[in-house]
Structure formats: C-alpha cells, structure tokens
Amino acid sequence: MISVNDFRTGLTIEVDGEIWRVLEFQHVKPGKGAAFVRSKLRNLRTGAIQERTFRAGEKVNRAQIDTRKMQYLYANGDQHVFMDMETYEQIELPAKQIEHELKFLKENMEVFIMMYQGETIGVELPNTVELKVVETEPGIKGDTASGGSKPAKLETGLVVQVPFFVNEGDTLIINTADGTYVSRA
C-alpha cells in the first residue's frame, strides 16, 4: 500500500482491479475542507486516460510491474511481434494496446515489455529515440531569423515540429514522453 501523498510521475498503482500509471498529479489544499490529490492516470491494459481525485492520505495498492528486455520485430496485421533477447520467445501485442508507443517503434529496436502477474500490459520506451526525417519542406535562407518551426514526417509516420535547418534524411532525437523534437543526432 502507498499513500496518494507519495504519488510520483511514472508510479504504477492498482485501483478498482485495473493497473494505472500516474502521468500527472497535484496536491490541492483548499482554504476550507480537506486536502486532496488530483491525478491523471493511464490504464496500462487499455491505454485509456482518466482524471481521478483522491482524498489526502488515502491508500492505494502499488502494482508490482516486471519488465523484460525485448526486441521489436515487425507488424503482423493488427498484431506487433516482440522477441525476448535471452530466450528468443516471441509475443504479440495488439496495436490498440500500444497505440502511443507505435509512433516511436522501429524494427529491431530494443524496448522493455511490462508484465503484471504474467500478463503483458504494455511497452516501456527509452526516454528518447532516433528517427529519420522522410518528408519536410526545404529550409529557405533567412527563415531562421524568426526562430520558427516546420512540420517533418518521420520514418514511423510521426509528424513533429522541427527547426527550419532540419532537412530530409536527417536523423533526429525525439522525446518519447511527448513526441517533441530534442536535437539532431
């Protein structure tokens, strides 16, 4: 059991028989009434995001998540195939379950698969990934004076805003938490 006062971003908890990851939290102490914790949670089984309020001091179960290092192999229709790096065992995950992560996955990429009581519940990506630009407008001399940005389509289909100096074929470092451009690789 863990107190909601000890919530941290990335913590996994069990509430109402479901496994949730804390995305955001805020301790609120109103002038009148009891303090509470407002949180934004992601269901690790379904990917649904829910805002939930807990009373300060309320206890919830901490979910013990095991991780296994695996390699993303390929997409097989609506299923995505991963291989354990030690045992060479393969597992399939439905696209719906890893919808957010698919924007960053490349073939042969190493990731951690999250397991809860033997059930595969999701993919844990590294903080940043390197992706190649496949389509973007050419930068025009003088564009950078205003410090603007332009859209760029990456090899996984993800579209991010990038500085004007980025060209097709460049490899970029992308933040997997929010899908933003970090730098050139």
Swiss-Prot record:
GO terms for molecular function: translation elongation factor activity. Pathway: Protein biosynthesis; polypeptide chain elongation. Disulfide bonds: none annotated. Signal peptide: none annotated. CDD domains: S1_EF-P_repeat_1, S1_EF-P_repeat_2. Belongs to the elongation factor P family. PANTHER family: ELONGATION FACTOR P, ELONGATION FACTOR P (EF-P) FAMILY PROTEIN. This is Elongation factor P.
